[in-house]
Amino acid sequence: MNFSPLPNRVIDAPKHLKTRMIQVRSSYFGYSLVIRPTSIFVGAPRAQSTLESQGSINETGAVYRCPLASGSCSHYVLNDKLNKQFQWLGGSMDGGTKDTDKLLVCAPRFFVPKNKNYGQMRGICYWVRDTVADTPPLSDVRTISLIPSQAEEHFMLELGLSAHVTDDNSGFLIGAPGVRSWKGSVLVHRGEDLAAQGSYAVKMLDSWDWVKNHFTYVGYALSSGYFSSNNRTSLLYVTTAPSSVLNTGKAYIFDVVGEIVRKLHVFHGEQLGEYFGYSVVAEDLNGDGLTDVVVSAPLNALGDSYDVGAIYVFINKGLFKFEKKIIRLPLSSGARFGSSLSKVGDINHDGYNDLAVGAPFAGNGAVFIFLGSEHGLRDEPSQRLDAPSREPGPYGAHMFGQGLSRGSDIDGNGFNDLAIGAPGAEAVYLYRAYPVVKIHATVRSESRAIRPEQETITVTACYRLETTSKARQMQQQELTFRMTIDELLQRVSFAPMRTNEVSFQAQAGLSGSCRNFSVGVHYTGGIFTPIDLELHYELAKKIPHSHEAFCESCAVVDPLEPKYATGTLSFMTGCAAHVCVSDLQLSSKDVNSSFIFGSLEVLSFSYEITNSGEPAYVAQFNVTSSARLPFAKVPGNCRVRHEVMLCDLNGGRALARGDSESLTIIFDVTQLSGQSLTIEAAVSSAGMDQNPKDNTMSTTISLREYAEIDASGGPIDGHIALKEYPYSAEVNNSYEFKSHGPSIIDELTVYVDVPIAYTVTGSAGIKSIFNISSLQMQATHGSELVPIKLYDQTNTLAKEYPLEDSSRRANRKRRELQQDQYAIMPDVNISDILTKENLPANRTLVLDCLRGNWTICVRSQMRVQLKPEQPIDLRISFKVDLNDFVNTFDYLVIFTNVEMFKEGDSTSIALKRNLKPNVIFNYSETPLPIWYIILSLIAGHLLLGAMTYILYKLRFFKRGKKEELKRLLEEHRSETKEPATDCEGNQEEINVEMHSDLEN
């Protein structure tokens, strides 16, 4: 928006510095940038060294300090020893914008050979406390490396692929995405860690238990901010893992407690292979004091175009809830929008921080400036800065925008400037920012109505400037105006030229100025149509769009600010006096006194305006809300500015006696919050009103949350049988808490009570069924882990899930939950369980936290923002020890109870439970007596013999078919003659064979 359209200084890679090795390809001068008040630090990761000690080492990489005044760069030496071939020094670099801030520089490809065949790409980093001196004494340079490891999973550490210095200068982060077979990790250095002198090796955090897969690249990009709405001074960290979850990518907000890494929130990419997490920036974009997150995905595809790029904007709504918006631009394939991100501060001084986004392969490269706003980052860029040259250089594409500095005011005009690196062109471009001014202008007449005999009227144009710049020349600017009046009907005109348009220039300052114009009235026909006035304005002096020097006296105006002002006048007639006295009455109908969040996306109000007096000229209706709600629909006769709707009644014509008009105003309530909403409406006209009290109406609506919630679940493994000593078992339960809306319940407290012991009847003894140390709980809401606090039977905090430093949880008590603070729907009774499961009442022990006075329970507490149809999944496991139980009872029934509570509102929740209990029973096997077996064998043999005899008597074993065939054969022989002698042998053989067949 207010950056110079062309660079004001170009800093080229230093050619005057002598190197022994020839530079055969681009040094990537400008790959990383850190801007300071008088100089720019430039990383050139493929540069040849100027040091004699490294004269034979190829492409060590270098960092240069380039004074802003001369642009003549010098080698900023951080180390002059060891073999640093192809180490990519300057591949990542970060630091604040003051010379007293730390400077962190890394060489992620620093290689340590082990033998002739292999080595370790460990990476190495250097940091200095400040850059006050032109060159740092090498003794003041701290070197950071990792503790060597021979494990293969640590051969490609790439320490320093990303580097980040916190905004408060208290510490820094270094990414190592190659650790543990490319699972990745982050090195966190805080104030207490920065006292070491010289070189030192550090241990990488290993407690990233929630990173399960290899090749996720945790630590690829880094940032930090203040994300917690409960503790706005707690600095938390952000890292990305662009290869997580089937290459859709993730980003994490995390904290470090001791050596434990706590995951607090996860952001997800959407598109396969988009490289979500290539860059990340944490910045408060909407001015609410909570840090928001922007994550880039430069390989995001748009339609048939590949690698166009996108940025994901996550606006922090508190309680680690973020509102997501994806910004894409209509760029060509391969532009890689989002390859670099940089926070440039509030460049236009509107109270919201802004962002620079690089697309280094959009032609020779481009940088887009996005402005912050009350609702976060604006959808469209306010400015596009293209590479100064469109022709490819000797090393190919310029990659303009690959390197971006932070925003810093280097010229003292109060507005942040920006440095942009083009490593393919080996150049850095400096863009200075112009001051921003705001023009306030109005146009009005001495009276809002023209009397019948009136021949002239006076129109006044007023104007002034508003700016945060302290420069006197910025507080006084020449403005160009163009004013029009009644261009269509030409009933009036500016005197004496008798024209409907007049132009003039005027000097505007911080205090208001006005200019009067005489307007002649020529025609009184068409008196029911109002006269329109428009005043167009702009700065007279334009910023140069050429390679001229920076214009020190120029300013810019936000392009989204109004460029003209309007006014209306009307003809007054049909009234008893010069001023019409109307009687406008405003009423509403069908207004509900309460509203449930989420029940509707829009809220409608119907108004009726009636005039019972003289004609009302220039009758207008305006409406706004206490929450400054946006309007879902704007009628054609209405316009909106700053969440106030102004409507011209009766099409701009006079509203006569007895006339009425109805309007329906529709508000968008998707973002509505609070306890009440007030709608202010009013009507007015050019004349006076008999009863001004009925011209306004204030409607207050109470707001409340309401949700119907189902709590269901129970044992995963069903009933558990204890067969033998030691009578212990693992109990695993799964529960789901699902809201059916309609409202989102903010800060819902969920209590889960689990029986842990019981008191013995008739004594003071207590028997435990499991040890609290074996109790494990994990709750997820969406993809996020929900923090759980576990209180023991004395109401003392015993555990927190995920586990955290025990020193932080000592002696904290839970708040007691009163029975009338929640609504419970009918639940299952203990007697129903005994009947349904057919359990003997005298041999069954039922433990129920809600009903049994003998039951001792532990209570867990969760606080979440519960959205409709986004359930909480809770897993509970514990190991029961019932060695003492089996001698007293055969069955144990354990009821896990759930209660929910919304502080300050006892009617916002309707809880329906369907929770199945755990049933555990003692299963014993009694050995079978030997005489049972003997009697069974004897009885079996007797039964078999009896059945065989019966079948024999029934001729079951008689072969009747065989006897019949034999008889038929004998009859056949007796009826035929004997065969001849020479055939006798054969005949006998045949008979024998036939007989054999019959036998068979």
Curated annotation (Swiss-Prot):
<feature type="repeat" description="FG-GAP 4">
    <location>
        <begin position="199"/>
        <end position="261"/>
    </location>
</feature>
<dbReference type="GO" id="GO:0009897">
    <property type="term" value="C:external side of plasma membrane"/>
</dbReference>
<comment type="function">
    <text>Possible role in cell-cell interactions. Minor involvement in the establishment of the oocyte anterior-posterior length.</text>
</comment>
<dbReference type="GO" id="GO:0033627">
    <property type="term" value="P:cell adhesion mediated by integrin"/>
</dbReference>
<feature type="glycosylation site" description="N-linked (GlcNAc...) asparagine">
    <location>
        <position position="853"/>
    </location>
</feature>
<feature type="repeat" description="FG-GAP 1">
    <location>
        <begin position="15"/>
        <end position="74"/>
    </location>
</feature>
<feature type="glycosylation site" description="N-linked (GlcNAc...) asparagine">
    <location>
        <position position="842"/>
    </location>
</feature>
<feature type="repeat" description="FG-GAP 3">
    <location>
        <begin position="145"/>
        <end position="198"/>
    </location>
</feature>
<keyword id="KW-0732">Signal</keyword>
<feature type="glycosylation site" description="N-linked (GlcNAc...) asparagine">
    <location>
        <position position="829"/>
    </location>
</feature>
<dbReference type="Pfam" id="PF20805">
    <property type="entry name" value="Integrin_A_Ig_2"/>
</dbReference>
<dbReference type="GO" id="GO:0001555">
    <property type="term" value="P:oocyte growth"/>
</dbReference>
<protein>
    <recommendedName>
        <fullName>Integrin alpha-PS5</fullName>
    </recommendedName>
</protein>
<feature type="repeat" description="FG-GAP 2">
    <location>
        <begin position="75"/>
        <end position="137"/>
    </location>
</feature>
<feature type="glycosylation site" description="N-linked (GlcNAc...) asparagine">
    <location>
        <position position="732"/>
    </location>
</feature>
<dbReference type="InterPro" id="IPR032695">
    <property type="entry name" value="Integrin_dom_sf"/>
</dbReference>
<dbReference type="GO" id="GO:0046982">
    <property type="term" value="F:protein heterodimerization activity"/>
</dbReference>
<dbReference type="GO" id="GO:0007160">
    <property type="term" value="P:cell-matrix adhesion"/>
</dbReference>
<comment type="subunit">
    <text>Heterodimer of an alpha and a beta subunit. Alpha-PS5 associates with beta-PS.</text>
</comment>
<dbReference type="InterPro" id="IPR048285">
    <property type="entry name" value="Integrin_alpha_Ig-like_2"/>
</dbReference>
<feature type="glycosylation site" description="N-linked (GlcNAc...) asparagine">
    <location>
        <position position="592"/>
    </location>
</feature>
<dbReference type="GO" id="GO:0008305">
    <property type="term" value="C:integrin complex"/>
</dbReference>
<keyword id="KW-0130">Cell adhesion</keyword>
<feature type="region of interest" description="Disordered">
    <location>
        <begin position="971"/>
        <end position="1000"/>
    </location>
</feature>
<feature type="topological domain" description="Cytoplasmic">
    <location>
        <begin position="951"/>
        <end position="1000"/>
    </location>
</feature>
<keyword id="KW-0325">Glycoprotein</keyword>
<dbReference type="GO" id="GO:0098609">
    <property type="term" value="P:cell-cell adhesion"/>
</dbReference>
<feature type="repeat" description="FG-GAP 6">
    <location>
        <begin position="324"/>
        <end position="379"/>
    </location>
</feature>
<keyword id="KW-0677">Repeat</keyword>
<feature type="glycosylation site" description="N-linked (GlcNAc...) asparagine">
    <location>
        <position position="622"/>
    </location>
</feature>
<feature type="transmembrane region" description="Helical">
    <location>
        <begin position="930"/>
        <end position="950"/>
    </location>
</feature>
<keyword id="KW-0401">Integrin</keyword>
<feature type="glycosylation site" description="N-linked (GlcNAc...) asparagine">
    <location>
        <position position="922"/>
    </location>
</feature>
<feature type="repeat" description="FG-GAP 7">
    <location>
        <begin position="386"/>
        <end position="448"/>
    </location>
</feature>
<keyword id="KW-0812">Transmembrane</keyword>
<dbReference type="InterPro" id="IPR028994">
    <property type="entry name" value="Integrin_alpha_N"/>
</dbReference>
<dbReference type="GO" id="GO:0005178">
    <property type="term" value="F:integrin binding"/>
</dbReference>
<dbReference type="InterPro" id="IPR013519">
    <property type="entry name" value="Int_alpha_beta-p"/>
</dbReference>
<keyword id="KW-0675">Receptor</keyword>
<dbReference type="GO" id="GO:0007229">
    <property type="term" value="P:integrin-mediated signaling pathway"/>
</dbReference>
<feature type="glycosylation site" description="N-linked (GlcNAc...) asparagine">
    <location>
        <position position="516"/>
    </location>
</feature>
<feature type="glycosylation site" description="N-linked (GlcNAc...) asparagine">
    <location>
        <position position="771"/>
    </location>
</feature>
